[in-house]
Amino acid sequence: MTLGARLVAPMIILLLFIPIELVKAEVITLTPETFSDKIKEKDTAWFVKFCVPWCKHCKKLGNLWEDLGKAMEGDDEIEVGEVDCGTSRAVCTKVEIHSYPTFMLFYNGEEVSKYKGKRDVESLKAFVVEETEKAAEKAQLEDKEL
C-alpha cells in the first residue's frame, strides 16, 4: 500500500464522522450571566431543564434532553436549555426550583408552564410545541392591545 493510500483511508473515516458533528443539536447551558437575557429573547420559547449532577432522577434522564434538542432542530422559535443548579444556584433560586429535575417553559422572559408529564421525547416535544403556540398567540394579542 502506498503512502497516499494509507493517508486516504483514515481521512475517509474522519470525514464520515464530520457530518454527525455538524448535525448535532445544541442544548444550551444557561448560567447566571446568560439566563435572563436568553429567556427574554423576543418571540422565542426556552424549554429549560434544571438539574444537579448528584440527583439520581436527573441521571436517570440519560440523553433525553439531548435527544429533545435534536428533535427540536429547525424550529427557530424554540430553544432547549439546561441549568446546573449546583453551579448556577442563583438562577435556580430566582425561578424557585425546589426539586430536581424541573422542566420549565419560558416565553419572552415569562414563565409559561412547568412540565410534569411523561419523560420521553414525543411527549416533551408535543408539550413544548403546544404551549409555545399558546404563548405566541397570547403575546400577539397583548401586542395588539398596546
UniProtKB/Swiss-Prot annotation:
GO terms for cellular component: cytoplasm; endomembrane system; intracellular membrane-bounded organelle. Disulfide bonds join C55-C58. The keyword rRNA-binding does not apply. The record marks R119 as: Lowers pKa of C-terminal Cys of active site. Residues 1-25 form the signal peptide. The active site is at C55 (nucleophile), C58 (nucleophile). The keyword Signal applies. Keywords: Disulfide bond, Redox-active center, Signal. Residues 26-133 form the Thioredoxin domain. Belongs to the protein disulfide isomerase family. Acts as a protein-folding catalyst that interacts with nascent polypeptides to catalyze the formation, isomerization, and reduction or oxidation of disulfide bonds. This is Protein disulfide-isomerase 5-1. The lineage of its organism: Eukaryota, Viridiplantae, Streptophyta, Embryophyta, Tracheophyta.
